[in-house]
Amino acid sequence: MKTLHVELGERGYPIYIGRGLLGHPDLIQAHLPGGQVLVVTNEVVAPLYLDRMLASLAGKDTGSVVLPDGEAHKTLDSAMAVFDALLARRFGRNAAIVALGGGVIGDLAGFAAACYQRGVPFIQVPTTLLSQVDSSVGGKTAVNHPRGKNMIGAFYQPRCVLADTDTLDTLPDRELSAGLAEVIKYGFIRDPEFLAWLEANVERLLQRDPEALAYAIERSCINKAEIVAEDETETGVRATLNLGHTFGHAIETGMGYGVCLHGEAVAIGMCQAADLSRRLGWIGDDEVARVIRLLERARLPVVPPRELDADAFLEHMAVDKKNVDGGLRLVLLKSLGEATLPVAVDAGLLRATLECYGR
């Protein structure tokens, strides 16, 4: 087992990474303040891991909520189902919520924890590659609005993150590739040595080589923890983690939540961001080709859906948390291994990317 730390003073917490961690109840119980625990999961994860999770909570007053699977259910209605379960069991402020699932469950359960009785502790138990390397770390919690992804949320840190890599054994291939998009992103935005390693080892990751996966998860979490420690609430460097996300969120919203997985949409968005960075003269054709090629090798889509034209993209991109005073701002690439903070860009060049890249 590897143990990393997110350094946020009194609100700092450990990230545990390793195989078989769900079978070590002492790990999770050490971070529970009281005797009441609600496990929030979904209908895909529950048959695989809910009983094991509840066994790790033996001796506690436990309950569970099993929600429908998918981004389309990351809603206020689903959050209300969590609140209903907490209230039905008369759980108080010393109760804890355990998020057992991927990014949707982690975001939703964390949001519910931030809101219930003005905040109760929660623990992240991510079961997908994407959630283990990205969404479970850093305290971003949210639900979606029909007009925009993650528009209703809060910064609220977990008590710990428990990443049992055994759960990746049951992860569908498509979900594994979607998680690799966020792994690869760290190489693009700040870690060129990791990028070179990924270019040499992406096939090992697709084959689920345990050593390669363990290294990629650890290196990704180190990058994420360092960024969060420097900028918890995204007023500076944390915004670079949004490379490809403005384009990607437009795809997710425009196509309907769940049609494209988050990692798939981000992969396309990173290619669009690379194309726009080239048009601005910051990177060259060779760098754009490296971006596209690595994502293709990770079995990710690299061209935008034909159903979304430039005007549709711009309409959805106008609803983005990085925008300032109604003006669009994007995270782009200065080089492979260095991202910009959100910047305003020439409208003509942006439209050229939206109209020409992948069309």
From Swiss-Prot:
EC number: 4.2.3.4
Compartment list: Cytoplasm
Keyword NAD included in the entry's annotation: yes
Pfam families: DHQ_synthase, DHQS_C
Pathway: Metabolic intermediate biosynthesis; chorismate biosynthesis; chorismate from D-erythrose 4-phosphate and phosphoenolpyruvate: step 2/7
Enzyme class, broadest EC rank: lyase
Gene Ontology cellular-component annotations: cytoplasm
Lyase recorded as keyword: yes
InterPro entries membership: Dehydroquinate_synthase, DHQ_synth_AroB, DHQ_synth_fam, DHQS/DOIS_N, DHQS_C
Main location as per UniProt: cytoplasm
Catalytically driven reaction(s): 7-phospho-2-dehydro-3-deoxy-D-arabino-heptonate = 3-dehydroquinate + phosphate
Binding locations of NAD(+): 69-74, 103-107, 127-128, 140, 149, 167-170
Binding site for Zn(2+): 182, 245, 262
Essential cofactor(s): Co(2+); Zn(2+); NAD(+)
Cofactor stoichiometry and binding remark: Binds 1 divalent metal cation per subunit. Can use either Co(2+) or Zn(2+).
Keyword annotations: Amino-acid biosynthesis, Aromatic amino acid biosynthesis, Cobalt, Cytoplasm, Lyase, Metal-binding, NAD, Nucleotide-binding, Zinc
Listed GO MF terms: 3-dehydroquinate synthase activity; metal ion binding; nucleotide binding
Single biological process term from Gene Ontology: amino acid biosynthetic process
NCBIfam families on file: aroB (TIGR01357)
Role, per record: Catalyzes the conversion of 3-deoxy-D-arabino-heptulosonate 7-phosphate (DAHP) to dehydroquinate (DHQ).
Family stated for the protein in its record: Belongs to the sugar phosphate cyclases superfamily. Dehydroquinate synthase family.
Name of the molecule in the record: 3-dehydroquinate synthase
